[in-house]
From Swiss-Prot:
Cleaved signal peptide residues: 1-13
Lipid attachment, kind N-palmitoyl cysteine: 14
Gene Ontology cellular component annotations, sorted alphabetically: bacterial-type flagellum basal body, distal rod, L ring; cell outer membrane
Keywords: Bacterial flagellum, Cell outer membrane, Lipoprotein, Membrane, Palmitate, Signal
Quaternary assembly: The basal body constitutes a major portion of the flagellar organelle and consists of four rings (L,P,S, and M) mounted on a central rod.
Keyword Calcium: no
Lipidated residue numbers (S-diacylglycerol cysteine): 14
Protein name: Flagellar L-ring protein
PANTHER family assigned to the protein according to its UniProt record, in alphabetical order: FLAGELLAR L-RING PROTEIN
Record gene name: flgH
Length: 216
């Protein structure tokens, strides 16, 4: 058992990922060729629709502001019940001329039962609120736009990376050239943190060992 304990420590220590500090290089979002239907008008530019207001994003490369307000509340529960029981009885009826009354007391019997019950519950909740500046990377023939925003922050070895993309209608952009996340279709949000603060929230190596030895 002692050898198994040290073997698990060695395996877990070898599996620990050591992060190397890499120089971050910004990559511009990929842009697509605009595909717009021909409008039979002298004012073909979409900006002409807002002659008395502020300029709103409408073409590839335009900047748009995205206000993210998302709440997460997930609850998952699992329960299992397993049971089994067996019983048997047998009596010896004849054995080399021994009297039947004597053999009746030589019967064999047994009973066994097994029951197992387990359950688990997972709950996660959180609120994500931020404002990002993104770009229009594609304009579809119906006027909707594919927008993408990314933000990368590194302070004292703690890294935060945020990526958002989705489809926006021009009508949902307000006069401040801002759209809220609840009006973005097919929205994808990627948020990841790396560093010693993030690792501090992870279980330690000893807790991982006990989780392997006692999974239930």
């Amino acid at each position: 058992m002692l050898y198994l304990f040290f073997a698990l420590i060695f395996i877990i220590s070898c599996s620990t990922k050591v992060e190397s500090k890499k120089k971050y290089t910004y990559s511009f979002p990929k842009t697509y060729k605009e595909e717009k239907p021909t409008r039979g008008s002298l004012f073909k530019s979409p900006q002409s629709a807002y002659l008395y207001g502020s300029v709103r994003a409408s073409e590839v490369g335009d900047v748009i502001y995205i206000r993210v307000i998302e709440s997460i509340n997930a609850i998952e529960s699992v329960s299992t019940n397993v049971g089994r029981s067996t019983s048997f009885s047998n009596a010896i009826s004849s054995f080399f001329g021994v009297h039947p009354a004597t053999l009746k007391n030589l019967g064999a019997g047994g009973k066994s039962s097994f029951a197992s019950k387990g359950g688990s519950k997972f709950q996660q909740s959180g609120v994500l609120t931020t404002t990002l500046a993104g770009r229009v990377v594609k304009v579809f023939p119906n006027g909707t736009m594919l927008v993408e925003a990314k933000k990368y922050i590194e302070v004292n070895g703690v890294k935060r990376e945020f990526l958002l993309r989705g489809i926006v209608r021009p009508e949902d952009i307000d006069s401040n050239n801002t759209v809220t996340s609840d009006k973005i279709a097919d929205m994808e949000i990627f948020f990841e943190g790396r560093g010693y603060i993030v690792r501090g929230g992870e279980p330690g190596w000893l807790a991982k060992i006990f989780a392997i030895l006692f999974p239930f």
